[in-house]
Structure formats: C-alpha cells, structure tokens
Amino acid sequence: KEHLPNLQVGNSSRLPFAEPLTGHNTVRKQKYIDFQQPKQYWWSGGVAGFRGTIVNWVDTLVNWNDGLDIDLASELFGAMFDYPLAASYPISDYNGEATDEWFTTAIRDQTAKMIANSGGQERYIPWVGLEHFGSNWLTASELDRILAEMQSQGTMRYCYFIYNSMKPEIWDVIRKYGQPQND
C-alpha cells in the first residue's frame, strides 16, 4: 500500500471459527488491505468445505476419545471454536440439506463476524461457492438462504466460485440477488 497506494489489495481467509486453525487474523490484516474475501464455503464431503471440516473434526474427537459421543463432541467443537449449533440440524446431519434454523444460527453468526472482522460491509467481498471436486454440493435452496442472510446483514457484493457447470436453478438464485451494473 505504501508503494502503490492506488492499487486495491484484498485477501482471502477462512470463516471466523477456523481462523485459529489457519493462522488468519483478519482484524489485524485490516490495516494492510482494502477489502477481505472470506470464504462462504459451506459444502461437505470430498474436498471439505466448512460443514465437511466440522464433521471431520467432530468425528476425529469421537474416534480419539473413548466414551465421547457425537453430541458431546459437537458441543465441544461449538465451544472451542465459538461456533453456534442449531438444535434442528446436528453435525451428524451435515451431509444433508440444512434447516432454516442453521441459517439463522451458524450462517448468521459467521457472516456477522466476517463483516466485523473485515472492517464493515464496504470492505467485505466474500467468496461464495457450492462445491469442490468430489464434495456434496449445496442446493439452490441453501445458496438462496446463504445469500439472503448475507444481504440481510448488508453484504453489497460477493464473488461466485464454481469449478463445474452452473445449473439453471443456481443461476436463478444468483440473479435474484444481483444488481445491474451502471456504466
């Protein structure tokens, strides 16, 4: 920034619950960058997105600790990483369609923290993606609820990430939250 002050600089990071695991300090990075692009990658399976990462952590806690069941391991994960759990959507169900409550707990919490850690809505430009190689895709309904939650918190723009083809129902959701560009 000192040498090229007119150049806009951004940086990508993980969700707030994963920052301690990945070495990101998004609040500290605010003074070095113009905007942040945290990842709203919530898929599971394959190359794990965040639901998959959470499932892997909880499964590992259970496998490594005799007598620890998945419910207690889930509570431990939530407490250790300041990640709110939705009663209607236990971590053991994370490979299936998410409930509305999950969007008003986990997604709401992590999005609010991302916006705050970025320095406000104007500096928050998240990546939004549905899948990675071999993962379980988010559905059009899940994408709609993620974008609705982001918009309700003042998100003004995002970058859509895709490796594969885009189905019409996904494009319809993206268009629903898109705004025409003024030339």
Where are each of the predicted segments found?
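Glycan-processing catalytic domains of CAZymes
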Residues: 1-183
